[in-house]
């Protein structure tokens, strides 16, 4: 599934419900308590004003202030809320590979959401009359253009505000608010609303309810007529009585069902929640879809979990939270030394349970081998560093010191197989079968054990900087030689001819990327794959103007870097 863009959305939802069932709970009484308090205390004239604001095609700072003021009042009344709780996951909270996977997914989710919001909110389409909007839609259909993001009539709702950060966390439905609005504004009893929403929630246990399902339920639950038939879009408040808001409310008031909506995050269970989520993700082949648009179930869960380390990710008020998920949850791969316990002190919780804190990392013997290799490097002399594949999911790293004719070269198995295959096809040519036996943790240990404040030379430093920072190595200094591609690869063929035998992991076929412009000639395919080690040698050759005369020596033996292949007897 990681290679496919198709998402079996409901299957993923069911798998996440099953995998995270231990974190779900029954919250019906708490939701109804908040709903009754909101229904009795809120000025619904103010609610109606905010709902009118959200129907406008262009909203201003004054409109945003009305929404924020009402959100503050609702937040004050609710017991179910998320509070500002920033979390930094470190080694020990999660395994190193889990930390890198989390950091990578948050970075990709950030890119996707920012592209989605840019596409959806920054283009104001004007105030054409309805007749011209209809005519424009007809012209677009005639020309073969599919309807783009936005509303069916072509109007894009935008926020024209000075400080867009004030929009953060002011949206999203809350079941207590949905129930209160349906009760008061629909002129219904709360019991009728609860019964109707429960029917939607029960349907949600077997499928995603749609507008056709809603129409079939209305004869038995007339209060559902208040639900809008318009499609949801980004930056639409919880005061809009959408089908999604109603389904969420129905899911949260079920007695059971292991619904994700009932998860509560706390400092005590946050790391376990993330660990279990990543396990389900790998088992089901879930991924961050890089296409702008709605979030898939994994993306939605990850965003909500990481927004705050304390609260209700799906159903609580979150208007007091500052920042986005990638701001409030981060990763630090710096390895902290274990504190020496005082004599007679009680064992740590993990030790009481018989757990080995090193299981996800290298053994002490393996760590000593890496330390010995690093100690051979001379920080006062030039050291080249290069990586291959994504900066938060690298598959290859090399350190090369020309003066001492030595190098450190290691690999790791990627988490993002789809991204890896793309990189293999267009850049490094590494095949999964050639690195699937790489010993996990070596690459992170190499970075973590580099001497403090060491100066490293690179060709292109952005990706390397991000990788070092995520490992907590902001102390390491980078010098970027900033060659053009032609300058950097001047000695490419000679390096591969003379030193190509040093690395046997680049066996794929490199395919040139297609240019977006039809008029542009296709970009030339590199003659050779990108190898972190050979690229370091090649970059140094370009600087010095000649090839190294002697073959460099590996500081980490190959048998240390890979698990032995299983032998089968016939």
UniProtKB/Swiss-Prot annotation:
Disulfide-bonded cysteines: none
BP-aspect Gene Ontology terms: negative stranded viral RNA replication; RNA-templated viral transcription; symbiont-mediated suppression of host cytoplasmic pattern recognition receptor signaling pathway via inhibition of IKBKE activity
Compartments, as annotated in UniProt: Virion; Host cytoplasm
EC number: 3.1.13.-
Residues holding Mn(2+): 386, 388, 535
Pfam family, any one: Arena_nucleocap
InterPro entries xref list: Nucleocapsid_arenaviridae, Nucleocapsid_C_arenaviridae, Nucleocapsid_C_sf, Nucleocapsid_N_arenaviridae
Site description Important for exonuclease activity, residues in chain: 463
Enzyme type, top EC level: hydrolase
Region entry Binding site for the cap structure m7GTP, spans: 54-236
Region called Disordered, residue ranges: 332-356
Ligand binding (Zn(2+)): 396, 503, 506, 531
Keyword tags: Capsid protein, Helical capsid protein, Host cytoplasm, Host-virus interaction, Hydrolase, Inhibition of host IKBKE by virus, Inhibition of host innate immune response by virus, Inhibition of host RLR pathway by virus, Interferon antiviral system evasion, Manganese, Metal-binding, Ribonucleoprotein, RNA-binding, Viral immunoevasion, Viral nucleoprotein, Virion, Zinc
UniProt-recorded Gene Ontology molecular function terms: hydrolase activity; metal ion binding; RNA binding
Chain positions recorded as Mg(2+) binding sites: 386, 388, 535
One cellular-component annotation, GO: ribonucleoprotein complex
Subunit structure: Homomultimerizes to form the nucleocapsid. Binds to viral genomic RNA. Interacts with glycoprotein G2. Interacts with protein Z; this interaction probably directs the encapsidated genome to budding sites. Interacts with protein L; this interaction does not interfere with Z-L interaction. Interacts with host IKBKE (via Protein kinase domain); the interaction inhibits IKBKE kinase activity.
Domain comment (free text): The N-terminal region is important for the cap-binding activity while the C-terminal region contains the 3'-5' exoribonuclease activity. A CCHE zinc binding site is present in the C-terminal region and may thus contribute to the substrate binding and/or the specificity of the exonuclease activity.
Family affiliation: Belongs to the arenaviridae nucleocapsid protein family.
Function per UniProt: Encapsidates the genome, protecting it from nucleases. The encapsidated genomic RNA is termed the nucleocapsid (NC). Serves as template for viral transcription and replication. The increased presence of protein N in host cell does not seem to trigger the switch from transcription to replication as observed in other negative strain RNA viruses.
Protein name: Nucleoprotein
Species of provenance: Tacaribe virus (strain Franze-Fernandez) (TCRV)
């Amino acid at each position: 599934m990681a290679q496919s863009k198709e998402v079996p959305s409901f299957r993923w939802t069911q798998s996440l419900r099953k995998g995270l069932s231990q974190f779900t709970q029954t919250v019906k009484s708490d939701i109804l308590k908040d709903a009754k308090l909101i229904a009795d205390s809120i000025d619904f004239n103010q609610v109606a004003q905010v709902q009118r604001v959200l129907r406008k095609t262009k909203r201003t700072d004054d409109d945003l202030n009305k929404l924020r003021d009402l959100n503050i009042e609702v937040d004050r009344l609710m017991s179910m809320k998320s509070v500002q709780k920033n979390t930094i996951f470190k080694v020990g909270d999660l395994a190193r590979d889990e930390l890198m996977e989390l950091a990578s997914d948050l970075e990709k989710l950030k890119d996707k959401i920012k592209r989605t919001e840019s596409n959806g909110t920054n283009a104001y389409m004007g105030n054409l009359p309805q007749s011209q909007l209809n005519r424009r839609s007809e012209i677009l259909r005639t020309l073969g253009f599919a309807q783009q993001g936005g509303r069916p009539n072509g109007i894009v709702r935008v926020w024209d505000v000075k400080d867009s950060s004030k929009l953060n966390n002011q949206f999203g439905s809350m079941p207590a608010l949905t129930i209160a609005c349906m009760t008061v504004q629909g002129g219904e009893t709360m019991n009728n609303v609860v019964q109707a929403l429960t029917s939607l929630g029960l349907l949600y246990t077997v499928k995603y309810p749609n507008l056709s399902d809603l129409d079939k339920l209305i004869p038995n639950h007339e209060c559902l007529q208040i639900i809008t038939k318009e499609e949801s879009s980004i930056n639409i408040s919880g005061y809009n009585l959408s089908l999604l808001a109603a389904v969420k409310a129905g899911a949260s008031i079920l007695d059971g069902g292991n619904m994700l909506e009932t998860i509560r995050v706390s400092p005590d269970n946050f790391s376990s929640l993330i660990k279990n989520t990543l396990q389900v993700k790998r088992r089901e082949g879930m991924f961050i879809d890089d296409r702008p648009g709605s979030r898939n179930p994994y993306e939605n869960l990850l965003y909500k979990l990481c927004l705050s380390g304390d609260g209700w990710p799906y159903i609580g008020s979150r208007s007091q939270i500052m920042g986005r998920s990638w701001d409030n949850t981060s990763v630090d791969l710096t390895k902290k030394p274990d504190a020496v316990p005082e004599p007679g002190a009680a064992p740590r919780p993990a030790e009481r349970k018989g757990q080995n804190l090193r299981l996800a990392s290298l053994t002490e013997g393996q760590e000593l081998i890496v330390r010995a290799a690093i100690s051979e490097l001379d920080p006062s002399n030039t050291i080249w560093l290069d990586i291959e594949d994504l900066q938060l999911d690298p598959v290859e790293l090399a350190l090369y010191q020309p003066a001492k004719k030595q190098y450190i070269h290691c690999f790791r198995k990627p988490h993002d197989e789809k991204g890896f295959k793309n990189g293999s096809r267009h850049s490094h040519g590494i095949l999964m079968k050639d690195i699937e036996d790489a010993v996990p943790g070596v690459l992170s240990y190499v970075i973590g054990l580099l001497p403090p404040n060491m100066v490293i030379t690179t060709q292109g430093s952005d990706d390397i900087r991000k990788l070092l920072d995520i490992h907590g190595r902001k102390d390491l200094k980078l010098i970027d030689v900033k060659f053009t591609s032609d300058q950097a690869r001047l000695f490419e063929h000679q390096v591969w001819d003379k030193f190509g035998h040093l690395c046997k992991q680049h066996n794929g076929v490199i395919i040139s990327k297609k240019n977006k412009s039809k008029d542009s000639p296709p970009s030339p395919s590199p003659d050779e794959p990108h190898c972190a080690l050979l690229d370091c040698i090649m970059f140094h050759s370009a600087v010095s103007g000649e090839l190294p005369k002697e073959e460099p020596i590996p500081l980490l033996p190959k048998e240390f870097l890979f698990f032995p292949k299983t032998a089968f007897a016939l």
